[in-house]
């Protein structure tokens, strides 16, 4: 290459928009980030302003370029990764949203989900979209907008409105309304996409009263969708060449492109994805079936499980229990004791996610004796994150019949060496922590870079996936099984609480 070229990842998250610029060696050379407003109109409702999402995201790219003096004509391509499921409906003639973006966390469509369950659609949804009937996904959010925004249904029927997840909205804005597109990973989170036939599901569209004319074209996660001159001087055109939802982008950034490879992102919650290749695995253990990326960005199947409380349980120790000054101190205190002294902490503050899906379970500390101190509770809380991860991975291995070779990890909590070592012990599996932990942005950049020839092959990318550290399991089998049995008993206590509560009433 005669002149230094770069690739950009736009990472549009739930609380902030970021731009990450990478060089050919996949080193991060510039990052810019802007937070935006969280809107809570009613209890359980969460919204964003789509124009603010666009304004913050476009300005981060300009800022990231300005920080390093990189010119726009040095950009080989742009990849986009985004908060999934968040739903935007806009008028294609005016370019204006008809309502705020309804965010993935928003629970306002619970009644619509109940109505669809009453119509006997649960099995159809699971078999054809891979998902469960839940307000989390986009479909019921679109229906809510059409049902509740004045004039929206009429405009939709007249072909004036477009739907998109955040990636679709950004590409539409970046191309001045020329391109209305999404990728397979984002489409698979809408509850409107048939993951068997890889097309929009007409039955689901009909059941929700959503005109097919609103839906974007669905493409691979690595191809040129259109050109933009965002942040460019003198009309420099830059190809938009990669799109993936945030968790699937992280899976790709971790180079989990073959069947049986899995990653866990330790954030507020934990998101586990396992690539199952070209085989669609329907879960019997409370997991979602979704679409991820194969080696060249082509659609591949994956299993997904979400743990509601990961790093958030450490924040609870800090903010509510006040037994930690900072989350980063948890490793120090956890290693001041040799064991948790028989204590288990089940952080079911908002119920339990996969594989239990128990909305009524509540947080529980069991096994307390007089000898238990705050260090034991801190250690047990960290252990609880690792046990929940094993719960999901056991379900994935049972569903897929694939034995996990290793677990690749990312997210804030992976800096905690105690947690990573305990995770390895509990799973009896190697845990691989990468040197670059910005794997979501990496995934989007890799997908775009492959599409424009910035990188030539997946092999070239795998050479760049340098590990910071490999954690190997130390525990003997008897000890591991005894501990895990104790965890399972503790989970039963968390689940029994609501049943006992009902008996008292």
Swiss-Prot record:
The pathway that the record names for this protein is: Polyol metabolism; glycerol degradation via glycerol kinase pathway; sn-glycerol 3-phosphate from glycerol: step 1/1
Q: Where does sn-glycerol 3-phosphate bind?
A: 14, 84-85, 136, 246
Protein keywords? ATP-binding, Glycerol metabolism, Kinase, Nucleotide-binding, Transferase
Q: What is its EC number?
A: 2.7.1.30
- SUPFAM superfamilies for the chain: Actin-like ATPase domain
What positions does the entry give for glycerol binding? 84-85, 136, 246-247
Query: Where along the chain is ADP bound?
Result: 14, 18, 268, 311, 412, 416
> By its UniProt entry, which Pfam families does this protein fall under?
FGGY_C, FGGY_N
**Binding positions for ATP?**
14-16, 268, 311, 315, 412
How is it regulated at the activity level?
Inhibited by fructose 1,6-bisphosphate (FBP).
Q: Give a GO cellular-component term.
A: cytosol
Q: Which terms does the record give in the GO molecular function aspect?
A: ATP binding; glycerol kinase activity
Instruction: Give the InterPro entries listed for this entry.
Output: ATPase_NBD, Carb_kinase_FGGY, Carb_kinase_FGGY_CS, FGGY_C, FGGY_N, Glycerol_kin
Q: Name one GO biological process term.
A: glycerol-3-phosphate metabolic process
**What is the catalytic activity of this protein?**
glycerol + ATP = sn-glycerol 3-phosphate + ADP + H(+)
User: What the protein does?
Assistant: Key enzyme in the regulation of glycerol uptake and metabolism. Catalyzes the phosphorylation of glycerol to yield sn-glycerol 3-phosphate.
Which HAMAP family does the UniProt record give? Glycerol_kin
UniProt record similarity statement: Belongs to the FGGY kinase family.
Give the protein name, as stated in the record. Glycerol kinase
**Lineage, highest ranks first:** Bacteria, Pseudomonadati, Pseudomonadota, Gammaproteobacteria, Vibrionales
